[in-house]
Amino acid sequence: MRVTVLVGGVGGAHFLLGVQQLLGLGQFGPQQCPDTLTTGHELTAVVNIGDDAWIHGLRVCPDLDTCMYTLGDGIDPQRGWGHRDETWHAKEELARYGVQPDWFELGDRDLATHLVRTQMLNAGYRLSQITTALCDRWQPGARLVPASDDRCETHVVITDPINDSRRAIHFQEWWVRYRAQVPTHSFAYVGAEKASAATEAVAAIADADVILVAPSNPVVSIGAILAIPGIRGALRTTTAPVVGYSPIIDGKPLRGMADKCLTVIGVQSTATAVGQHYGARRTTGILDCWLVHEDDHAEIEGVAVRSIPLLMSSPKTTADMVNIGLQLAGVSA
């Protein structure tokens, strides 16, 4: 079975672990051999690139790297991002030079990933090709595909806390430096009008047996993916059912600041509102099925809805909720 998942960073990576456990892939599958040869299943993640940024002259792709490190068993378990057993000598030396930005941390081991990526970009390789090359080192047990090979970044219009004027900043500055604690007016997917979906991403959607929308941030993760021309169209025309998982439980996000992002775009922080925001595929949206938490209730015209436990407390519990979604869509793992 070919499973394609739309994901963001930390939450999306944990969701992918659950999919892998259900399918017997990656850390949960046979070792020393290609997983698809032994399980008959194939997992592709179409990953958000809206968080990507140039930092100290290097191209940093936070969500791609978080998925790669997590599935490759190299993530820092305390922080949930970056390398395990990281050191910070370069960061400390940059601080002594007074180099900005000083609010974005890059560890020494993590720098190697960004150096390789930047060198390959400068040599003319596409981000999709580079991601495949990086994954050769990590063996994540899934194919990681950027939503686009083009530059398409999420920017945020805020009121500057110093001079009280409106200005646009990169999402990373809003998220990491300000922790979303500044007056925020809108989000913009800069470059989307000139970007196109990666060929590999479109193919993964078109060829899938089922497509899962992870409970990632619906604005700056899934929303940023859907903003790329070609992605939404591929979701609407694929023959595979599209199953979404609510990132909101009892009015609060599973993780991160999805509620703050939803408020900015005028969407309530409820499972129903997010499902309606995505919309039914039989009208103009992307969903066939929508999974909400057992204490929530949702009715979305044209979408099959089921209430189940949605807390991703372990790969096993996540695998269970993935399996229920497949059953709702009429697909068997």
UniProtKB/Swiss-Prot annotation:
GO terms for biological process: F420-0 metabolic process. Its cofactor is Mg(2+). The keyword Cell inner membrane does not apply. Keywords: Magnesium, Transferase. GO terms for molecular function: LPPG:FO 2-phospho-L-lactate transferase activity; magnesium ion binding. 7,8-didemethyl-8-hydroxy-5-deazariboflavin binds at residue 65. Its EC number is 2.7.8.28. InterPro entries: CofD, CofD-like_dom_sf, FbiA/CofD. Pathway: Cofactor biosynthesis; coenzyme F420 biosynthesis. The keyword Oxidoreductase does not apply. It catalyses: enolpyruvoyl-2-diphospho-5'-guanosine + 7,8-didemethyl-8-hydroxy-5-deazariboflavin = dehydro coenzyme F420-0 + GMP + H(+). Homodimer. PANTHER family: 2-PHOSPHO-L-LACTATE TRANSFERASE. Belongs to the CofD family. Catalyzes the transfer of the phosphoenolpyruvate moiety from enoylpyruvoyl-2-diphospho-5'-guanosine (EPPG) to 7,8-didemethyl-8-hydroxy-5-deazariboflavin (FO) with the formation of dehydro coenzyme F420-0 and GMP. This is Phosphoenolpyruvate transferase.
